[in-house]
């Protein structure tokens, strides 16, 4: 099974949210539709700007924790390294099973 660590943004250089999931397509859909009450709904954080994939749940959880502890500037640098225009990557995730291991794409 694949696991994904992802970063959502409200806009370029806006509010950021780091999460982990086993189903990125479903989870991004939930964020965009405000299915669950919480941070992303409150701050309108709906734009998928970065993701990476692993097959190990413990690696995904550790990476999520690591990114959550990073300084904001480091997260922005990570996003801009692979997605300099801060494009919404949610339209590119329909082929995740055969796709790249990062959302830098």
Question: What positions do the PLM features span?
Answer:
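GIY-YIG nuclease catalytic motif and its immediate N-terminal context
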Residues: 1-37, 41-53, 58-65, 82-84, ...
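Short arginine-rich
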Residues: 42, 65-78
């Amino acid at each position: 099974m694949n696991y994904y660590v992802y970063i959502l943004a409200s806009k370029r250089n806006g509010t950021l949210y780091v999460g982990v999931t086993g189903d990125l397509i479903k989870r991004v859909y939930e964020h965009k539709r405000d299915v669950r009450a919480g941070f992303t709904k409150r701050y309108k954080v709906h734009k998928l700007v970065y993701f990476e994939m692993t097959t190990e749940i413990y690696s995904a959880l550790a990476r999520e924790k690591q990114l959550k502890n990073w300084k904001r500037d480091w997260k922005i640098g990570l996003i801009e390294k692979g997605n300099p225009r801060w494009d919404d990557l949610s339209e590119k995730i329909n082929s995740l099973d055969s796709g790249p291991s990062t959302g830098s794409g």
